[in-house]
């Protein structure tokens, strides 16, 4: 009888199974890692442990992976399925030498020497019983629950107390064939493999648990002893004519107001609550790109998460996802408005640090906050902040606030040793709880102050909210970014470290816009966002079911065949499935008559649904512009369409944070896809097939309101070439209100003054504003914008501008 089949061993496994709940990272190793089911597989573990292998066995049974108890058969010879780097630690004395474990590596390498076709995958597996990073002063707790190399007695205690928080993490497989071919098969290579494995497990533990937590008061005193803080305190005392002790006391109060007080115990409790909450709210949370972030952590990067801000749920969602993806929840920069009882203390113990809306005029507060942020980076804590500064009320990304990004970049300039990397994160929901409140605020109602009653009110309304989406965008490593933007930045700083570089502000602004662009690059297309985009482009927000299905299938085909970026995700299924999901979530309305089903958006929900449309409108705005050219312009050639797109793209880019690498290639690919879909023909010029006209008109409707805004602006510019920027913004907004009243435009962003401000800044940058040297360009773009509008809308704009000009 084998050891694992003995009654004693089975009894131990049965007891452990009752005590242990295991979370697997990643959830699907075959999909997220480079595992090949057709190649033999061997697990590499740090320490030989009966309980660890038993926990791994439960996971492998669940995932359909080879059992750790099942030996590997290599051409009739048996090899171990699990290779450990070191032996178990005895209760007393030292663990045995590593010769036995090195022999396991040597046997596997020798098998590759004998069998040239053999290619075993070595898969590192890390096991964690709880994820407490430990504190600088918790030596007693560490003695009882020492996690790195526990004895069997300590392991029993860990299983009893932390068994419900067991994590099994698989890492990328390594080819043993590659190692044998490149480095040989002798004992020296086995030793190297074991050494590499030890380093891997050490780094992996730090990714999973994070750095040791400092004592909060000791941290405060250490921060106040830094040279920069001493200088700031002295300046505060001199400027306010107070004692240094009083200034120091003020600095300590600021630190107490700002600093997080991370508690692993609270995080474990919150994890259980949030698991219940997400299961109650959502049918699932879709995640894309987590593996690249795990790798950045593993490689020693200081990670700064910069998500978009849709809802108060964002704070919880990203931390929860990172926890379950085997990473430490970040320290989150939260607005001081969220520091209300009892949520504030709970957020603080969950990792939140609080930030005032404005630092202006308060040099001591600025110095304290900067020093605290530097300390987070220096100690290796990941950080999260929202660059928009507040939640988007329209579903579009807001213009970035650059304060936190500037502070992060300044930390790099002051010499943070580890590479600091910004990770843009797209957060999306099939239902945002605050949408109704947002539209009340947009219509003039005063914003409610956050309180515990709002939280209770939100929880009371819990229901089926569909799915959530977390997509990690393309990371931006700040050292590389600085090298790209200012190649000589190190030399300049070395010459005068105290002087603010003249290039810093434009470099920060460019970085902030790049972050926002990469958030949008990682957008998630869902059933709700896509159906709302289609229906809101129709005349009555309603379509026949068959027509809606056909249109959704077209959009899905465009998004998958010509992907916006490699970071974008597109919902699985066809148009029929997307409609069914929308109906289930009560976002769509179904009416039936003898001629068939009609799918619509209820009038009471129409404005709210613009929020979801706006989440992804940037993904289909270029296809929509192309469709406008094809349906509104006679004998449109490929070159003419490309020229039209190039005219409007700078404004679209500024408004929607778009970042298409090669615009001309992208337009050509979209045109080729429309040809492949059978909607158009090409013979020097494009012609629309009769069967494709309705689909293209509907696609063109997505950019309709945007083109109306551009037509307003360029008609005003053409009539008054030297118009001032403030006057253009005011007149554009006034004309938009008139146009909306006459043609029933209800989308909130159509009347957004800030949007016209963004466009006017871009126009000035392009040289179109207050400069008649570009009058020919303005006239051309005005003509193109007018040609893409319905005749009634065009006439309203032309007549209104003429009346304005004559007044």
Swiss-Prot record:
This entry carries the following GO cellular component terms, namely: plasma membrane
Q: Which SMART domains does its entry note? A: PlsC (SM00563)
Please state the pathway this protein functions in, per its UniProt record: Phospholipid metabolism; CDP-diacylglycerol biosynthesis; CDP-diacylglycerol from sn-glycerol 3-phosphate: step 1/3
- InterPro entries from the entry? GPAT/DHAPAT, GPAT/DHAPAT_C, GPAT/DHAPAT_LPLAT, GPAT_PlsB, Plipid/glycerol_acylTrfase
Q: Please state what class of enzyme this protein is.
A: transferase
Query: Where is motif HXXXXD motif found?
Result: 308-313
Give GO terms for biological process. Answer: CDP-diacylglycerol biosynthetic process; fatty acid metabolic process
Q: Where in the cell is it found?
A: Cell inner membrane
Q: What is its EC number?
A: 2.3.1.15
- Cross-referenced NCBIfam families, in alphabetical order? plsB (TIGR03703), PRK04974.1 (NF003441)
Q: What is known of its domains?
A: The HXXXXD motif is essential for acyltransferase activity and may constitute the binding site for the phosphate moiety of the glycerol-3-phosphate.
Q: What is this protein called?
A: Glycerol-3-phosphate acyltransferase
